[in-house]
């Protein structure tokens, strides 16, 4: 099993959460703030300058079977891409075990 974590721009969430042709069982979405190469930026508010160090992002997490990982990664990449700095990152890691709390199911059946 794989866990895919994608850090994306918030306005891309609707496109990422329902990629066409990929049967996702479910996702977890978390609001986040951060910066990468683009760093922050300066904003002017009521005549005063403010440095915005952390930019709003959304973290999307999906756990799925190994054989579905590449298709989901590509679907997320295509949906989240704007071609501009700050599009985000996708992290892929192995998941050793999944347990559904309600039923006690384990492994791929628990997803």
UniProtKB/Swiss-Prot annotation:
UniProt GO BP: nitrogen fixation; regulation of nitrogen utilization
Gene expressing this chain: glnB
Metal-binding is among the record's keywords: no
Entry protein name: Nitrogen regulatory protein P-II
Role of this protein: In nitrogen-limiting conditions, when the ratio of Gln to 2-ketoglutarate decreases, P-II is uridylylated to P-II-UMP. P-II-UMP allows the deadenylation of glutamine synthetase (GS), thus activating the enzyme. Conversely, in nitrogen excess P-II is deuridylated and promotes the adenylation of GS. P-II indirectly controls the transcription of the GS gene (glnA). P-II prevents NR-II-catalyzed conversion of NR-I to NR-I-phosphate, the transcriptional activator of glnA. When P-II is uridylylated to P-II-UMP, these events are reversed.
Subunit comment: Homotrimer.
Database matches in PROSITE patterns: PII_GLNB_CTER, PII_GLNB_DOM, PII_GLNB_UMP
Any GO MF annotation of the entry: ATP binding
PANTHER family: NITROGEN REGULATORY PROTEIN P-II, NITROGEN REGULATORY PROTEIN P-II HOMOLOG
Entry keyword set: Nitrogen fixation, Nucleotide-binding, Phosphoprotein, Transcription, Transcription regulation
Xref: SMART domains: P-II
Keyword Flavoprotein assigned: no
GO cellular component, one term: cytosol
Residue list for modification O-UMP-tyrosine: 50
One family name in Pfam for this protein: P-II
SUPFAM superfamilies named in the record: GlnB-like (SSF54913)
Listed Gene3D superfamilies: 3.30.70.120
Similarity comment: Belongs to the P(II) protein family.
């Amino acid at each position: 099993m794989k866990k895919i974590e994608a850090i994306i721009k918030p306005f891309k969430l609707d496109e990422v959460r329902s990629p066409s042709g990929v049967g996702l069982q479910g996702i977890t979405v978390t609001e986040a703030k951060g910066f990468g190469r683009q760093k922050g930026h300066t904003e002017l508010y009521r005549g005063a300058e403010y440095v915005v160090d952390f930019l709003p992002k959304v973290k999307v997490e999906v756990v799925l079977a190994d054989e579905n990982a590449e298709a989901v990664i590509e679907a997320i990449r295509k949906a989240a891409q704007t071609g501009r700095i700050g599009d985000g990152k996708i992290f892929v890691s192995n998941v050793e075990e999944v347990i559904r709390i309600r039923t006690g199911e384990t492994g791929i059946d628990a997803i």
